[in-house]
Every structure is written in structure tokens, then in C-alpha cells.
Amino acid sequence: MSSESKLILIGIISSPYGIRGQVAIKSFTDPASNILNYELKDYRKNIIKIHSAKILSKKIICNIDQIVTRTAAEQLTRTKLYIYKHELPQLPDSEYYVANLNGIKVKNLEGEIIGKINNICNYNAGDIIEVVYNDGKKIMYPFTNEIFPQITEDFVVIVPPEFI
């Protein structure tokens, strides 16, 4: 799959809302309302067209094209919402998208390649980076400047907590 056609997860339909087919969306964009600026797709690349939306607390409540009953909205629960990677805005050199870190090399302070980033998770308390070391061992670390002091397109430098 080319980078032009690669899908990036930017939100999820978390639940139905009300009785008229509205849904609540959890956005992974910053700010959350930015999700409304994109043409959203499901994993099959079907377009999810939003008619209208309002922000309530931490949820985005949406009316989706052709969804007019609660039963129809319930069927969309847990639908992941994607955009094409090339739709993301270009960032300054000092910034990066967390999703772009997946699979890049991990180096120690001496510059030796000691593993790679295997996964990035967010449990609402901040991003967690899973590193797979060259020996196969997997360890999860909080994504902080202290633990990951250098980040480039090609690698990150790690200072594991026992060394801080």
C-alpha cells in the first residue's frame, strides 16, 4: 500500500446518542473538533458523511448521512474513522505525528540501534510507546521528553527510566 493510500485512524464512533440516529464520536485530533475538517472513511474506505455536529463536553455529537434511527446508529458503534495519510497537514520540522513513529528505530545514548517502536497507545493519561528490543523483549514507556529526548524521522533516542 502506498503512503498516498495509507489510512490513519483519527477517531471512533463510541455510541449512539438519542433516538434520532445521532452518534457520539471520540476524536483523536487536537483539537477534537478538527476531525470535522476531513472526509472520514471506515476500514473499507466507505465515506462516513457528517451532516451536522455539536460538541458536548468531550464528545462530538453527529448526524451521519442516511442514519436516522437509534437502531441504525447502534450498528455503527465502535466504527473506526480514518483519513488518508496525505490529507494530514504538513508540520514544521520540529513537530511530528505520533502515528509516524510506528516501526522506526530506537537508539540508546551511544547511538546503537537497540530496537524499534512496535506500538503507540493512548489510555487517556498520555501516549505510551511500546519498544521491541533486538532480543525480542517488549517494554512500554510513557512518551515523555525525559525518556525520548531525541526524535527524528528515522529514529528515536531512548533513556529508559532506570537511567534517568
Curated annotation (Swiss-Prot):
Q: Biological process GO terms, please?
A: ribosomal small subunit biogenesis; rRNA processing
Domain of life where this protein originates: Bacteria
Extract the GO molecular function terms from the UniProt entry: ribosome binding
The principal location of this protein is cytoplasm
Instruction: Recite the UniProt keywords alphabetically.
Output: Chaperone, Cytoplasm, Ribosome biogenesis, rRNA processing
Q: Give one Pfam family, short name only.
A: RimM
- Kindly state one GO CC term assigned in the UniProt record: cytoplasm
Q: Where in the cell is it found?
A: Cytoplasm
List residues of the PRC barrel domain: 92-164
Q: What does the comment on domains in this protein's record state?
A: The PRC barrel domain binds ribosomal protein uS19.
What family does the Swiss-Prot or TrEMBL record give for this protein?
Belongs to the RimM family.
Role description: An accessory protein needed during the final step in the assembly of 30S ribosomal subunit, possibly for assembly of the head region. Essential for efficient processing of 16S rRNA. May be needed both before and after RbfA during the maturation of 16S rRNA. It has affinity for free ribosomal 30S subunits but not for 70S ribosomes.
Fill in the subunit field for this protein. Binds ribosomal protein uS19.
The protein depicted here goes by the name Ribosome maturation factor RimM
